[in-house]
A protein has these predicted regions:
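Acidic (Asp/Glu-rich) sequence patches and key acidic residues
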Residues: 1-154
Length: 154
């Protein structure tokens, strides 16, 4: 399963201005929007954005598709299991408060820690935890950036 970011923000497309602002202000990154669902779609919870990420802080760049959908029981069970595996106390409760899940898919090649950094950016706007594709734990913005920093130093 791809990396999931639990989101309290109900509309990924409407969150684009904040994502762009946070990328520059807090992540020293260039984020370019390559495409998105129309803003006036029938279900705001369902949508996508195509993004190009390039970081100045830690090595990493890539093109990604982020899709949004309603969170379901499988997502919540996966969050509970990851919390137990990773000893991430309280993070599954935060995930349970999130009505949406944003899924990150790499399109083409991503280098360095681009996906980790993008997941941190998304979590900063979504106000929910990140569930990495290996399901090993749950973490927030700080946890994602700590992993990116550690990977950049190795």
């Amino acid at each position: 399963m791809p990396t999931r970011v639990f989101s309290q923000e109900p509309d990924l497309v409407a969150a684009l201005p904040r994502l762009l602002q946070h990328a520059r202000r807090f992540f020293a990154a260039d984020l370019n929007v390559l495409g998105s669902s129309p803003p006036d779609r029938a279900s705001p919870q369902e949508g996508y954005v195509g993004l190009r990420w390039e970081s100045a802080r830690y090595p990493g760049q890539g093109t990604f598709r982020v899709t949004s959908r309603a969170a379901n029981d499988d997502d919540r069970f996966a969050a509970e299991a990851a919390e137990a595996r990773g000893r991430a106390g309280g993070m599954s409760e935060l995930a349970a408060r999130c009505a949406c899940v944003w899924t990150i898919t790499t399109e083409g090649e991503a280098t360095g820690t681009a996906e980790l950094q993008l997941s941190a950016l998304l979590a900063s706007v979504a106000l929910g935890p990140v569930l990495p594709e290996d399901g090993s734990t749950l973490y927030g913005v700080r946890g994602a950036m700590e992993r990116a920093e550690k990977a950049a130093q190795s």
